[in-house]
Amino acid sequence: GKYSGKKNSSETYLKINIEAAKEACAQIRLRNISGIIIIDFIDMESESDRHKLMDELKLLAGKDPVKTTVVDMTSLNLVEMTRKKVRKPLYEQISLPKSDN
């Protein structure tokens, strides 16, 4: 990946998780995913790093025109988010109707 062992591992994990958060939020918007969303991040032991990641996620979610709420992070580094459904997700919009045959 982009980050290697030149820095300490906790700093590397934080950077990777922040990049993952950016991409996850972009994909959620692109695919118009709604409902309860769980994101599994690399384990971080530092409470400070967890807060930095949550702050970044809340900032990213705030940029979404659809109401998106970052709920919490569990001890397993799973982040729960909710996103309001305003229209069908992308996969439903482009799916062909099933035939009756």
Features from the language model and the residues they span:
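Conserved glycine-centered short motifs in functionally critical loops
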Residues: 2-101
